[in-house]
């Protein structure tokens, strides 16, 4: 663990509390560190679109080989080659830099160490293992260019991920962040949210002022951790009940709503629909959860809403065969419903 800076003193009791809170927070939210912001000050070494296109077109650059390695690792489930290419420190720096409060340096060290330990146990790219993971094209999200991949898993699960890259030497690249289209968020943004909650819990009013809920989540940290444990145990009904008992501001926290959604998806169709409608009230931008909402609209036969979301996804990805197929299915089912209604009307 990194040495505790003398210029950033904390009492022994507060340090002990900090260590415990870091472990609780990272454990509670580890499931969303990928899938998982605020503007930060870390300098980005990302290659831009022009640079990425140029290297893809140049066989000597090695970028095509890099893409092939990623695809092979994901499909076979042999994740270690890709894990070694992730610049963990850069992601953590992007998530934690820019907070100038007494105690922040120590908090950053402990948060970073705990997060690395979590990654060592589970891996940053673990959710991709064994999926059909295919490179599509260079694409920019939130002003950061990257390599866009389509991820198709079991039960027709579909998502898209963009890997931002740095070039550390000839034919040598590192993954500097991962954008998840299904959540409209980079890994560093997910971590940033968790880090700010930790600041609110430990750094007094200055820390609380950094969060949108002014520390409400931090005040419920132990309860959120308990909910997370219920989720890991597969106690879906208990998770939903526990979330409903949280303060309103905490219920609407993005991470808590994702925990609630995961439980609802395993509990009942009705519960899932309720959570997604609550999500839309808290986060009206459909592109913050586009793939889940597209499926939600399809289930409810809200064809126009489903078409709107899928069409926007097609625009953002630059086109995709599976999304195009989904759009065709929407149009077919809508036309079928119209025909059935016309036939019924004619009979009457």
For each of these PLM feature ranges, what is it?
Residues 237-246, 270-281, 304-314, 337-348:
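Alpha-helical repeat scaffolds
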Residues 103, 107, 111, 115, ...:
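Long, contiguous interaction/recruitment modules in multidomain scaffold/adaptor proteins
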Residues 40-76, 210-223:
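Short, low-complexity N-terminal intrinsically disordered segments enriched in polar/charged residues
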Residues 234, 267-268, 301, 335:
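Residue-level detector of the short coil/turn that links helix A to helix B
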Residues 66-110, 242-248:
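Short, well-ordered alpha-helical segments enriched in acidic and aromatic residues
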Residues 255-260, 288-295, 322-326:
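Alpha-solenoid helical repeat scaffolds
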Residues 250-251, 284-285, 318-319, 348:
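Short coil turns that delineate tetratricopeptide repeat
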């Amino acid at each position: 663990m990194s040495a505790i800076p003398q210029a950033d003193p904390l009492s022994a009791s507060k340090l002990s509390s900090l260590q415990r809170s870091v472990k609780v927070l990272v454990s509670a939210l580890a499931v969303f560190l990928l899938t998982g912001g605020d503007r930060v000050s870390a300098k980005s070494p990302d290659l831009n679109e022009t640079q990425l296109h140029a290297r893809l077109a140049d066989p000597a650059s090695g970028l095509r080989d890099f893409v092939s390695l990623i695809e092979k690792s994901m499909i076979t489930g042999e994740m270690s080659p890709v894990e070694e290419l992730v610049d963990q420190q850069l992601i953590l720096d992007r998530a934690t830099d820019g907070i100038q409060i007494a105690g922040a340096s120590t908090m950053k060290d402990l948060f970073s160490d705990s997060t690395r330990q979590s990654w060592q146990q589970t891996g940053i790219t673990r959710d991709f293992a064994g999926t059909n993971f295919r490179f599509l094209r260079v694409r920019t999200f939130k002003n950061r260019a990257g390599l866009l991949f389509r991820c198709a898993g079991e039960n027709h699960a579909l998502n898209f991920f963009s890997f931002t890259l740095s070039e550390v030497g000839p034919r040598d690249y590192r993954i500097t962040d991962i954008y998840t289209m299904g959540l409209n968020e980079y890994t560093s943004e997910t971590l940033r949210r968790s880090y700010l909650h930790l600041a609110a819990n430990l750094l007094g009013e200055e820390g609380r002022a950094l969060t949108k809920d002014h520390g409400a989540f931090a005040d419920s940290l132990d309860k959120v951790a308990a909910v997370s444990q219920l989720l890991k145990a597969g106690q879906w009904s208990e998770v939903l009940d526990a979330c409903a008992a949280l303060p309103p501001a905490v219920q609407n926290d993005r991470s808590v709503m994702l925990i609630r959604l995961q439980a609802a998806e395993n509990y009942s169709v009705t519960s899932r629909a309720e959570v997604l409608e609550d999500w839309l009230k808290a986060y009206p931008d459909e592109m913050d959860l586009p793939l889940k909402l597209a499926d939600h609209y399809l289930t409810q036969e809200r064809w126009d809403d489903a078409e709107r979301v899928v069409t926007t996804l097609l625009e953002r990805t630059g086109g995709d065969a599976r999304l195009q197929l989904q759009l065709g299915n929407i149009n077919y089912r809508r036309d079928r419903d119209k025909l059935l209604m016309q036939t019924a009307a004619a009979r009457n």
